[in-house]
Curated annotation (Swiss-Prot):
Organism: Human herpesvirus 1 (strain 17) (HHV-1)
Segments crossing the lipid bilayer: 252-272
The protein's role, per its UniProt record: Plays an essential role in virion nuclear egress, the first step of virion release from infected cell. Within the host nucleus, NEC1 interacts with the newly formed capsid through the vertexes and directs it to the inner nuclear membrane by associating with NEC2. Induces the budding of the capsid at the inner nuclear membrane as well as its envelopment into the perinuclear space.
Gene label: NEC2
Annotated protein name in UniProt: Nuclear egress protein 2
Localization annotation: Host nucleus inner membrane
Length: 275
C-alpha cells in the first residue's frame, strides 16, 4: 500500500517529528505520549520499529482514532507501507504502539466484521493494520469516501482487564456531509468548465485578430464610409452623388460637346427673340 506523501526537502528528523506531533494533536490528551524509535527518519526512510506510543492508566475510558492515525502515517510515507497499531495490556496500563509495517509475530485477524469487541487479559496483545481495516469496511459495505465512516477504538481500562470496542463512527449529520461533498464536486466541475470556456474565447479572439490584420493589409482598414443622413435623400444630394460617379471622357470629345451645347442654346435664345 503506497503512501501519498509529498517530498520533504528539510532535515529528515524534523519531518518525522512533525508527523509525531500531528498524531499527538488528534489523540486524546489523557493518553500519555512516549517516544518511539530514535533515528533520522524521512518519508522515504521509515522506522522499522515503533514510531510512537501512548499509555492509558487504570480506570480510564478513552477513544483512539485508529483509522485517522493509520491513514495519516500512510499519506506521509513515500514508499509502500501498511501502517499497523498494536494494543497491549501491560498489567498496569494499556499501551498503543504505531508501526509502518506489521512487526514479526504481531497478532492479526482478531478484528473481523463479526467480531468487533476484544477483551485483553494481562500481557495480552491485539492489533489491526490499515489493509485489514479497509477489508472490513468493504465487507460491511460502508462508504469509503473521506469524512464518512471512520473506525475508532473505545478503550475501557479496568485492571486486570482491558476492554476494546472497534466501531465505525460517521459524521453527526450524514446528509449534510454528503451535500458538502456534492457541492465541492460541483464547484470543481464549474471551475473546470470556466477555464475551458476562457481558453476557447481566447483562441477565438486570437483568430479574429489575425484575420483583421490581413484585412488592413489590403488597404481597406477603414471600412465603408458612413451615410451622411439617416432620413430620405434630397434631389440635390442625389445630383451630387451622380456627379461623384460621372466619368469624364477624352478632352477633344468634351470640347466638341461643349460647342454643340453652346450652339443649341444660342439657337433656342434667337428663336425665342424672333417669336
Amino acid at each position: 500500500m503506497a503512501g501519498l506523501g509529498k517530498p520533504y526537502t528539510g532535515h529528515p528528523g524534523d519531518a518525522f517529528e512533525g508527523l509525531v506531533q500531528r498524531i499527538r494533536l488528534i489523540v486524546p490528551s489523557t493518553l500519555r505520549g512516549g517516544d518511539g524509535e530514535a533515528g533520522p527518519y524521512s518519508p522515504s526512510s521509515l522506522p522499522s520499529r515503533c514510531a510512537f506510543q501512548f499509555h492509558g492508566h487504570d480506570g480510564s475510558d478513552e477513544s483512539f482514532p485508529i483509522e485517522y492515525v493509520l491513514r495519516l502515517m500512510n499519506d506521509w510515507a513515500e514508499v509502500p507501507c501498511n501502517p499497523y497499531l498494536r494494543i497491549q495490556n501491560t498489567g498496569v496500563s494499556v499501551l498503543f504502539q504505531g508501526f509502518f509495517h506489521r512487526p514479526h509475530n504481531a497478532p492479526g485477524g482478531a478484528i473481523t466484521p463479526e467480531r468487533t469487541n476484544v477483551i485483553l487479559g494481562s500481557t495480552e496483545t491485539t492489533g489491526l493494520s490499515l489493509g485489514d481495516l479497509d477489508t472490513i469496511k468493504g465487507r460491511l459495505g460502508l462508504d469509503a469516501r473521506p469524512m464518512m465512516a471512520s473506525m475508532w477504538i473505545s478503550c475501557f481500562v479496568r485492571m486486570p482487564r482491558v476492554q476494546l470496542a472497534f466501531r465505525f463512527m460517521g459524521p453527526e449529520d450524514a446528509g449534510r456531509t454528503r451535500r458538502i461533498l456534492c457541492r465541492a464536486a460541483e464547484q470543481a466541475i464549474t471551475r473546470r468548465r470556466r477555464t475551458r470556456r476562457s481558453r476557447e474565447a481566447y483562441g477565438a479572439e486570437a483568430g479574429l485578430g489575425v484575420a483583421g490584420t490581413g484585412f488592413r493589409a489590403r488597404g481597406d482598414g477603414f471600412g465603408p464610409l458612413p451615410l451622411l443622413t439617416q432620413g430620405p435623400s434630397r434631389p440635390w444630394h442625389q445630383a451630387l452623388r451622380g456627379l461623384k460617379h460621372l466619368r469624364i471622357g477624352p478632352p477633344a470629345l468634351v470640347l466638341a460637346a461643349g460647342l454643340v451645347l453652346g450652339a443649341a442654346i444660342w439657337w433656342v435664345v434667337g428663336a425665342g427673340a424672333r417669336l
